[in-house]
Regions:
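Non-catalytic C-terminal accessory region of glycerolipid acyltransferases
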Residues: 129, 174-292
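Membrane-anchoring hydrophobic helices of lipid-metabolizing enzymes
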Residues: 1-114, 118-119, 153-156
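Catalytic core of membrane glycerolipid acyltransferases/transacylases, capturing the structured
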Residues: 68-71, 109-171, 201-203
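Short, flexible loop segments at the rims of nucleotide/cofactor-binding pockets, characterized by
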Residues: 89-98, 165-171, 210-212, 256, ...
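A structural signal for well-ordered alpha-helical scaffolds and beta->alpha junctions
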Residues: 15-18, 37, 53, 72, ...
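Short coil/turn connectors at secondary-structure junctions
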Residues: 108, 135-136, 188, 230
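Short, contiguous strand/loop micro-motifs
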Residues: 9, 43-44, 141, 167, ...
C-alpha cells in the first residue's frame, strides 16, 4: 500500500472541542495543566495514528537512532509541546526573553526559507517586541489546509497581530510576487517553508540526497525566492532545554545564471535541513513518509 503524503493525513488529536477545552483549562488553571493535557493527547495520537507513527519509526531507523519507539514518542511529545508553545505565542503569553537570536541583525528586507525542524511559527512573539524590533510587517506563506482545525480555532480567539499577515501558498500569482517584492524593499520580511510539497503542486518538485536517500522537495519556494532578488536565509527555531534557539544561514552564490543559482540554492537548503535534522532529530516534525 502506498504511503500517504503529509497533506493526505488527517489531524488526529486536534479537534475543535479539545482546543476549546485547552483554552478553558489555560484560562482557569494556567500553563501546567495544559502541558499535562498535551501529554495524554499525544499519547492517544501516538497509539492511534499508525501512518504517522510508522513514518516516525522509519525516520529514526534511517538515522540509526537507538530505542526507536522511545525516540518516536519523544518526537510526538515535542510536537505536542510545540503546539502549546504556539498557542501561548498567539495568546501573547510566551516570554520573548526565552529566545536566543543570531548575532547578525537579519530580520529586515529578507526572504526566509523555513523547515519543519523546530517551531519557527512561535517567532511571532519576537515581532511583538517594539523595543527590540522596528515595527514591520512579517509575511508568512502557509499551506491552506495545514493544521486547519488549529488555525480556525485561533481565529475564534479574535486576536489580531497587525505586524503579521498570512498568505495561502497555493494562491501565489504574478500579482503576489510584485506585492511581496515591494514589501521586502520596504523593509518587511517573508517566511516560506521549503521542505513540503503541496497537494496542488505535487509534480513541481526536485529530487535531492537527504539523509542518504533520494527525497522530493518543492521547487516553487526556491524559484520564488530567487525571483524576488533579495537576501535569502535558511532558518530554524528549535527548543534547547527551556530556551528557543534561532539558527540562520545566508544563501550565497557567485553564479550569474539563474538556473545555476537555483542549483546552488537546492544544495545549500537541503544541506541546512539535514544539518539541523541530525542535530535535533526529535524536533523533526514531518510525520509522513518522505522516503517512499
Amino acid at each position: 500500500m502506498t504511503a500517504k503524503k503529509w497533506f493526505q493525513l488527517s489531524e488526529e488529536g486536534a479537534g475543535k472541542l479539545r482546543l476549546q477545552a485547552l483554552k478553558f483549562m489555560f484560562d482557569k488553571l494556567g500553563e501546567f495543566p495544559v502541558r499535562i493535557i498535551a501529554f495524554f493527547v499525544v499519547l492517544s495520537v501516538f497509539l492511534q495514528a499508525k501512518d504517522r507513527r510508522n513514518a516516525s519509526l522509519k525516520f529514526f531507523k534511517i538515522i540509526n537512532k537507538k530505542h526507536l519507539l522511545l525516540s518516536a514518542y519523544r518526537q510526538f511529545l515535542n510536537y505536542g509541546n510545540s503546539l502549546v508553545d504556539k498557542f501561548l505565542s498567539v495568546m501573547g503569553k510566551l516570554d520573548p526573553q526565552k529566545f536566543e537570536l543570531p548575532e547578525e541583525d537579519i530580520f529586515k528586507s529578507a526572504f526566509f526559507i523555513t523547515t519543519h525542524v523546530g517551531n519557527v511559527e512561535i517567532m511571532r512573539s519576537l515581532f511583538q517586541l517594539k523595543n527590540k524590533f522596528e515595527p514591520k510587517r512579517v509575511n508568512i506563506f502557509l499551506q491552506a489546509n495545514a493544521c486547519k482545525i488549529f488555525n480556525d480555532f485561533l481565529k475564534t480567539l479574535e486576536l489580531h497581530i497587525p505586524e503579521i499577515e498570512a498568505f495561502p501558498v497555493e494562491e501565489i500569482s504574478p500579482h503576489t510576487s510584485i506585492e511581496i517584492s515591494d514589501r521586502i524593499q520596504n523593509g518587511e520580511i517573508v517566511f516560506m517553508a521549503g521542505d513540503r510539497i503541496s497537494a496542488q503542486n505535487e509534480n513541481i518538485a526536485y529530487e535531492a540526497e537527504f539523509l542518504n536517500h533520494k527525497v522530493k522537495f518543492p521547487l516553487g519556494t526556491l524559484k520564488f525566492a530567487l525571483m524576488l532578488n533579495v537576501p535569502v536565509y535558511f532558518i530554524v527555531c528549535v527548543k534547547d532545554r527551556k530556551k528557543y534557539k534561532i539558527f540562520a544561514e545566508k544563501f550565497v552564490s557567485d553564479k550569474q545564471k539563474r538556473t545555476e543559482k537555483l542549483e546552488d540554492l537546492k544544495l545549500q537548503y537541503v544541506n541546512f535541513l539535514e544539518k539541523y535534522t541530525l542535530m535535533y532529530p526529535e524536533q523533526f516534525f514531518n510525520f509522513y513518509d518522505m522516503w517512499e
